[in-house]
Amino acid sequence: MSFDYEKAMLQGHSFNEYVASVLRQYGVPEVYVPEFTIASTHDAIADKTRNEKDIVVDGLVLEVKSRSLVFNSLDDFPLSSILVDTVYGFDQKLIKPYAYVYISQKTKAMFAIPSSSRQFWTMGMIFDTAKAIEVECYFVTKRHCRPFIELVDVLLERAAQEAEPACE
């Protein structure tokens, strides 16, 4: 059975929409989810890898990673080492994500991995069973991750600072 890229991308996009809706519920302004598209040529796939954005919040890019793992918070996430992104995918991005949002496909619980933790990321190989290939990935430990609400607070603080009139 071959990997169904379109189905996986569509499912991923639905989690982008869900995370964006939660951000809006918390009052985060200027939350935008780009339209869902499928790249079908080699050039289009390469362009999508470089330029795709899951969620944009006032110019900041958030990347959503949905996993079929059960967790209710960062504290009970079942793995000690967390896959951030593929090395190829991250390194090709023209605009690096401000943060990654991890979401459980089972519970909808979330936590954030700030890209400012990049210096603490390590590299390792995984075997992607769905695609039947080995992939080099970036990993981070839980201590460099943050509860989702902390990301919300940072985004709200940024919005409030931008809304304040400039002192003259």
Place the predicted regions along the sequence by residue:
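Nucleic-acid endonuclease domains
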Residues: 1-61, 65-168
